[in-house]
Amino acid sequence: MPTNTLADWFSAPLGAYLLEKERAYLDDETPDIFGFHALQLGLPQYDLLRENRITHRMKIDVGGAVDVRARLNELPIATQSIDLALLPHALEFAEEPHALLREIDRVMMPEGRIVILGFNPWSLWGMR
């Protein structure tokens, strides 16, 4: 399911319910993650780091209303420069999930935090 389809699904009742649960989780878990630079990879139409206190936040995706347009496995970000990375369902739709994880590892600060949202692949929602 491409991310456009996922965004459409989040507009439907069941998807909106899940999106609200994910937002509530992120609002509770990310406010006190300290740092200077945060990025959200994918779903740029949603501000999923809205409660985080990091002032320099970037939304990166291949298109849409983003701060940086880039392939997610080729980020134009300096090595070891990101304090918080959010991947909202990015691994499910990545052409090369391992390449994406390697790229995230490259840009993360040594004590940086990575938050991954995804469907349980063994649940009914995770089935394709």
Task: Indicate residue ranges for each PLM-predicted region.
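Class I SAM-dependent methyltransferase Rossmann-like catalytic core
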Residues: 1-31
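Class I SAM-dependent methyltransferase SAM/SAH-binding core
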Residues: 24, 28-78
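Short glycine-/acidic-enriched loop or helix-start segments at secondary-structure transitions
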Residues: 49-50, 96-97, 125-126
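Hydrophobic beta-strand segment of the Class I
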Residues: 85-86
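A short His-aromatic
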Residues: 89-96, 107
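A short glycine-rich, Lys/Arg-flanked "PGG" loop and its adjoining helix->strand segment in the class I
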Residues: 98-113
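Conserved class I S-adenosyl-L-methionine
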Residues: 113-128
